[in-house]
């Protein structure tokens, strides 16, 4: 049995980015043969990636990139908030955002097929899964290309906003993006609010108003009032500016001689059902697995 030295482990780690203990195990199994150990490790990491790729990803980050006349916002997911802070994961997310802005892929599948680091985006993603031991997925992205201005805002990497706007004052774009992150409007104006959201709000308002026992004409006015209030609350232009409660966003923009054309808001994990771990069951499963080894 060949002696496994620290320098051998370090060399294998430098080649594969695998954890130190995994490198040592592979070298031991390969009897000190570095090339064989690397092959064993790549197979092992590949298997690790395939197992991880089926797990729920409800944590992650939002990353942004603006360059020239294009900007992008992307959401990448992982399984834990610990990995969401991992340097390699964060670097990959930034690279993906830049690729979206510069290459204009049609969808996530097209993005995944783009060349990256001598391979493809998806191959790099799978290698990252093998390295960190968690599933990593590119969930969604949005790209703006315009002769107007683009502003982005990230709040703790979990909330991201991209805004297309006009006007000379770049602070306006930053302020609007920050406001969107804080107040989370669903549309630019009342007219842009999706019909299904309005219908839902109207049904809720009708049920509440019906319980009041008031005459039908009064109930109808109550319902209309509730719907109008809702539309103002969820449309960007009608919202009260978070930095000045004496102005709406529309008034602030008018004073700055600016307009907002469109925006997008991403919140990490929005709509994804997080896995609920049963700690006792997890420990029992680990014990059972250990007995089988």
Swiss-Prot record:
Disulfide bonds: none annotated. Coiled coil: none annotated. It comes from the Bacteria. NCBIfam families: tsf. Belongs to the EF-Ts family. Residues 80-83 are annotated as: Involved in Mg(2+) ion dislocation from EF-Tu. This is Elongation factor Ts. SUPFAM superfamilies: Elongation factor Ts (EF-Ts), dimerisation domain, UBA-like. PROSITE patterns: EF_TS_2. It is found in: Cytoplasm. Gene3D superfamilies: 1.10.286.20, DNA helicase RuvA subunit, C-terminal domain, Elongation factor Ts, dimerisation domain. One of its GO terms (molecular function) is translation elongation factor activity. InterPro entries: EF-Ts_dimer_sf, Transl_elong_EFTs/EF1B, Transl_elong_EFTs/EF1B_dimer, Transl_elong_Ts_CS, UBA-like_sf. Associates with the EF-Tu.GDP complex and induces the exchange of GDP to GTP. It remains bound to the aminoacyl-tRNA.EF-Tu.GTP complex up to the GTP hydrolysis stage on the ribosome. Keywords: Cytoplasm, Elongation factor, Protein biosynthesis. One of its GO terms (cellular component) is cytoplasm.
């Amino acid at each position: 049995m060949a002696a496994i030295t620290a320098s051998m482990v370090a060399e294998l780690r430098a080649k594969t980015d695998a954890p130190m203990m995994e490198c040592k195990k592979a070298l031991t199994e390969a009897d000190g043969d570095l090339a064989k150990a690397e092959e064993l490790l790549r197979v092992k990491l590949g298997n690790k990636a395939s197992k991880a790729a089926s797990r729920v990803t409800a944590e992650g980050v939002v990353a942004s990139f603006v360059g020239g006349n294009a900007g992008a916002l992307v959401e990448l997911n992982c399984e834990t908030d610990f990995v969401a802070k991992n340097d390699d994961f964060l670097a990959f997310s930034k690279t993906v955002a830049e690729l979206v802005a510069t290459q204009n892929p049609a969808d996530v599948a097209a993005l995944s097929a783009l060349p990256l680091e001598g391979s493809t985006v998806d191959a790099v993603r799978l290698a990252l899964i093998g390295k960190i031991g968690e599933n990593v997925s590119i969930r969604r992205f949005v790209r703006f290309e315009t002769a107007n201005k683009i502003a982005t805002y990230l709040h703790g990497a979990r909330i991201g906003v991209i805004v297309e706007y006009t006007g000379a004052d770049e602070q306006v774009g930053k302020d609007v993006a920050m406001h969107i992150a804080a107040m989370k409007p669903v549309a630019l104006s009342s007219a842009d609010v999706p019909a299904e959201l309005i219908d839902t709000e109207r049904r809720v308002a009708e049920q509440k108003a019906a319980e009041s026992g008031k005459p039908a004409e009064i109930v109808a006015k109550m319902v209309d009032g509730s719907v109008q209030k809702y539309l103002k609350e969820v449309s960007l232009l009608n919202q009260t500016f978070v930095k000045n409660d004496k102005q709406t966003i529309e008034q602030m923009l008018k004073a700055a001689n600016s307009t907002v054309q469109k925006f997008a808001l991403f919140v990490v994990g929005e709509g994804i059902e997080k896995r609920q771990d049963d700690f006792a069951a997890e420990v029992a499963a680990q014990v059972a697995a250990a007995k089988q080894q």
